[in-house]
A protein has these predicted regions:
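Compositionally biased, intrinsically disordered low-complexity regions
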Residues: 7, 25-28, 66
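Intrinsically disordered, low-complexity segments enriched in polar/charged small residues
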Residues: 7-8, 35, 84
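Long, intrinsically disordered low-complexity tracts enriched in Pro/Ser with mixed acidic/basic residues
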Residues: 13, 17-19
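Bacterial extracytoplasmic/cell-wall-associated proteins, especially those involved in peptidoglycan
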Residues: 42-174
Length: 174
């Protein structure tokens, strides 16, 4: 029999395997790991809304009316829906000699981005079958040009057709 020194472990031999028996300190109680709540990632604006905001920057940033700015976006979306134009927002905006006020290098103004996203959401709701979504420009208006007085004139044909007279009710402040 061997005398043990303080802190030494006693061992019992059992079929050639060492088994610890006495003077063993139990392991510390483990606290379950706390998983931190994930920090919400800020929602990145979708690419189409960014393109539309850049178009608004170039085509309508000096226009005071939100309704008239929204009409620029509706004009783009009308073309997306029309068989005579590309079927994507970027395709419509980047088509040669069309939206000369669009550039992917233009800044993305937060207010213009919010307006672009709002119109895009309304258009998608309309495409999904919703009724009155707050459309400010009829579907057949595919063209616009500056009137020289800080406004755009929207038309159903490229040349010499009557300009839209703003008879639709607008969901935006004037």
């Amino acid at each position: 029999v061997r005398h043990m020194l303080p802190g030494e472990k006693a061992e019992t031999m059992y079929l050639g395997a060492a088994v610890s028996t006495v003077n063993e300190t139990p392991p510390p109680a483990q606290t379950p790991a706390v998983t931190p709540e994930p920090t919400p990632t800020p929602r990145q604006p979708e690419r189409d809304a960014v393109y539309l905001a850049q178009c608004l920057w170039g085509e309508a940033r000096g226009i005071p009316s939100q309704t008239e700015k929204a009409a620029v976006v509706w004009c783009v979306l009308n073309r997306v829906d029309h068989p005579g134009f590309p079927d994507t927002i970027h395709g419509v905006l980047s088509a040669p000699n069309q939206f000369l006020g669009f550039s992917e290098r233009f800044p993305v103004d937060p207010e213009l981005l919010a307006l672009a996203q709002d119109v895009l959401d309304r258009w998608r709701a309309e495409t999904a079958g919703a009724g009155d979504v707050g459309r400010v420009l009829p579907k057949d208006y595919l063209w616009f040009s500056a009137d020289g007085h800080g406004h755009n004139a929207f038309r159903a044909t490229f040349r010499q057709s009557a300009a839209w007279q703003w008879t639709a009710e607008s969901p935006y402040p004037t």
